[in-house]
């Protein structure tokens, strides 16, 4: 990975600084109701958004598909009741119904989040069909 890109991705964000200091996440920025992260707030008018993955996030779910690509190091995710460790090069795919959290990670543990509205997959559905297990998982 390009060193400049890595340094940019690895930098601790203001959001992460606040979480590390014990502050609560800014729910107005992320959630429409309860602990459900909202696509309209995070994706605005886009179908797909790529952003640095927050290294420490409490239990939540979302109304979009989340893909987490581990660019460097590793992170531990609790998905439902299952503990998953993803390592450099791994991709974690979470559907809209997944409730999960990310355990605290180090500065060198860098992941990229790819947030996708379910409507993005409409063209894919015409190819694979609606009665497939992948369709059930994604939507």
Q: Where does each model-flagged region fall?
A:
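N-terminal regulatory/effector-sensing and dimerization cores
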Residues: 46-136
């Amino acid at each position: 990975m390009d060193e400049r890109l890595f340094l940019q991705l690895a930098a601790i964000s203001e959001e992460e600084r606040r979480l590390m200091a014990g502050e609560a996440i800014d729910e107005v920025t992320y959630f429409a109701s309860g602990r459900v992260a909202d696509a309209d707030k995070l994706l605005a008018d886009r179908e797909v958004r790529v952003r640095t993955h927050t290294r420490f996030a409490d239990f939540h779910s979302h109304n979009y598909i989340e893909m987490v690509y581990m660019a460097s190091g590793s992170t531990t995710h609790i998905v439902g009741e299952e503990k998953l460790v993803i390592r450099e090069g791994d991709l974690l795919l979470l559907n809209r119904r997944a409730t999960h959290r990310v355990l605290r990670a180090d500065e060198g543990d860098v992941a990229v989040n790819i947030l996708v509205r379910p409507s993005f997959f409409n063209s894919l559905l015409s190819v694979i069909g609606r009665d497939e297990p992948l369709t059930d998982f994604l939507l």
